[in-house]
Structures are given as structure tokens and as C-alpha cells.
Swiss-Prot record:
<keyword id="KW-0106">Calcium</keyword>
<dbReference type="GO" id="GO:0004623">
    <property type="term" value="F:phospholipase A2 activity"/>
</dbReference>
<feature type="binding site">
    <location>
        <position position="28"/>
    </location>
    <ligand>
        <name>Ca(2+)</name>
    </ligand>
</feature>
<feature type="disulfide bond">
    <location>
        <begin position="11"/>
        <end position="71"/>
    </location>
</feature>
<keyword id="KW-0378">Hydrolase</keyword>
<dbReference type="Pfam" id="PF00068">
    <property type="entry name" value="Phospholip_A2_1"/>
</dbReference>
<protein>
    <recommendedName>
        <fullName>Basic phospholipase A2 acanthin-2</fullName>
        <ecNumber>3.1.1.4</ecNumber>
    </recommendedName>
</protein>
<feature type="disulfide bond">
    <location>
        <begin position="29"/>
        <end position="45"/>
    </location>
</feature>
<dbReference type="GO" id="GO:0016042">
    <property type="term" value="P:lipid catabolic process"/>
</dbReference>
<dbReference type="InterPro" id="IPR033112">
    <property type="entry name" value="PLipase_A2_Asp_AS"/>
</dbReference>
<dbReference type="InterPro" id="IPR001211">
    <property type="entry name" value="PLipase_A2"/>
</dbReference>
<keyword id="KW-1199">Hemostasis impairing toxin</keyword>
<feature type="disulfide bond">
    <location>
        <begin position="60"/>
        <end position="84"/>
    </location>
</feature>
<keyword id="KW-0479">Metal-binding</keyword>
<keyword id="KW-0800">Toxin</keyword>
<feature type="active site">
    <location>
        <position position="48"/>
    </location>
</feature>
<feature type="disulfide bond">
    <location>
        <begin position="78"/>
        <end position="89"/>
    </location>
</feature>
Length: 118
């Protein structure tokens, strides 16, 4: 679920940046998304959005699905047994790892309503 996703983000970036820093970033980080991703981090969010879309097609409620995971050496590791839990956990873990590798550009905060995301 989204709370667990926040924990995964903290795990992968070693606590360097709060998950809240990603809520209003670029065109895809946060609720919804449109247009072309503005950078690598925004692309991570677009991929995560698409992954959640696939989870919804499988009738897995990705924003609310609870799963089992642990932080092992700054890497989120999924331990879920059910198909839905595993799928959603994998979406979140992949995004958290992607976020940790991508540069963070403060100029891309709050641009969602601008023409760059049309």
C-alpha cells in the first residue's frame, strides 16, 4: 500500500529524502500523470503508475494492498505469498530502487499543472 511504498523509498535512499518529496514531482509523481516525463525520476513514477495500472487490471487494489517486505542492506525485498501482494510489492520495490538511482531536480517540483505535462 502507499504507506509501505513510503517505507520502501526511505529504505532504498537510506533515509536521505522523505517519500513526501516525491508526491508533487514532475508530471507523474503523485496522483495521476500525463504528458512526457521531465527526467529520469519522473520516468520512474510513470513506470510505477503503469505498474499500478496493470495491478488494477488483475483486480489487485495497489494503493490499499498490504504486503510483506523487509529492508535488507538498503534494498527493499518482497516476501509476499499471494499473487496480488507480490505483484504490488514488486511494483513498489522497483520504483523505490529507481528513485534511489535517479537524480532529484528541485526545479521539477509542482510543475504538474503547467503545459510541460499536457
Amino acid at each position: 500500500n502507499l504507506y509501505q511504498f513510503g517505507g520502501m523509498i526511505q529504505c532504498a535512499n537510506k533515509g536521505a529524502r522523505s517519500w513526501l518529496s516525491y508526491v508533487n514531482y514532475g508530471c507523474y509523481c503523485g496522483w495521476g500523470g500525463s504528458g512526457t516525463p521531465v527526467d529520469e525520476l519522473d520516468r520512474c513514477c510513470q513506470i510505477h503508475d503503469n505498474c499500478y495500472g496493470e495491478a488494477e487490471k488483475k483486480r489487485c487494489g495497489p494503493k490499499m494492498t498490504l504486503y510483506s517486505w523487509e529492508c535488507a542492506n538498503d534494498v527493499p525485498v518482497c516476501n509476499s505469498k499471494s499473487a496480488c501482494e507480490g505483484f504490488v510489492c514488486d511494483c513498489d520495490a522497483a520504483a523505490a530502487k529507481c528513485f534511489a538511482k535517479a537524480p532529484y531536480n528541485k526545479n521539477n517540483i509542482g510543475i504538474g499543472s503547467k503545459t510541460r505535462c499536457q
